[in-house]
C-alpha cells in the first residue's frame, strides 16, 4: 500500500536540496494518492502527487468539505481506520458523488490504528520520552541497588580481613609453641601431628586451648624474650611441662608470677647457657 519508490524519491530530493530534517515532509506524503487514513488523534488525506492535508479529528470535517468544494468531479477515496458512513456525514449533500472503499485498519503493536508507514519510515519508540517517564522511579532503585552492592562488598572484605588476621595469629602462636617448625604448609595437619608427637593419648581440644593461652602470654611485651623449646603433657596427672629459654633469670620470675594466676607453678633448676638461661616449668590447673 505504501509507495516506497515515491518515498525514496522524496527522500533523495530532500537530501539533494540540503533538507536534512524529515519533519519538513508532510505526513500525508507517506500514503498513496487517493487514500485517507485515520487514527485516534488525526486524519491524513493525500489528494494527488503534490497535494494533501492533515488535521485533528475536530478540524478534519472542515478540511474534507474544503477538498470536496475544490473538486467538481466525483471523488473516489480508499480509507483506513474510518467508517464510510462518517465520511458521508462529513460530505453532507455532496455524498452522492463520493465513492468510498474501506480497508481493514492496520494496527502495529504499540502504534495507533491507521499507521501506514513501513520500512525505514516506520515510527520508532521515543526512548527519551520513556526515560523521562520512568527515571523518577528508576534512579532511586538504581541508587538503592548500588548501595546494597557496596555494603555487601564491604562486608565480604571485612570478613576476609578478619579471617586473614585470625589465621596470622594462629600461625604465630603455633610457631611460638613449636619453634622446631620452621614453615607452615597446612596448619591444621601440622598442629595435629605436633600434638600426637608430644601427647599421644589426650584430649586435643583442651590441650590446644591451654597451649594457645600460654602462647598468648609468652607474646606479651614483658615476656617477649622467652622462647618455647618444647613441652610434654602428662594426661593421667594433668600436668604440662614446658622447656623454656630466656634472656635472664628475671624473665623466669616474671613468667612464674603471670602463670600463677591460673596454674600451680613449679620451676625446675635454671641453667646458664652463654648469654641466656634455660630451664623448665611444670604447670597444673588450679
UniProtKB/Swiss-Prot annotation:
Gene3D superfamilies: General secretion pathway protein M, EpsM. Keywords: Cell inner membrane, Cell membrane, Membrane, Protein transport, Transmembrane, Transmembrane helix, Transport. Its main location: membrane. The keyword Transmembrane helix applies. GO terms for biological process: protein secretion by the type II secretion system. Pfam families: GspL_C. It is found in: Cell inner membrane. In many other E.coli strains this gene is part of a type II secretion system, but in MG1655 the locus is missing a number of genes. Involved in a type II secretion system (T2SS, formerly general secretion pathway, GSP) for the export of folded proteins across the outer membrane. Belongs to the GSP L family. This is Putative type II secretion system L-type protein YghE.
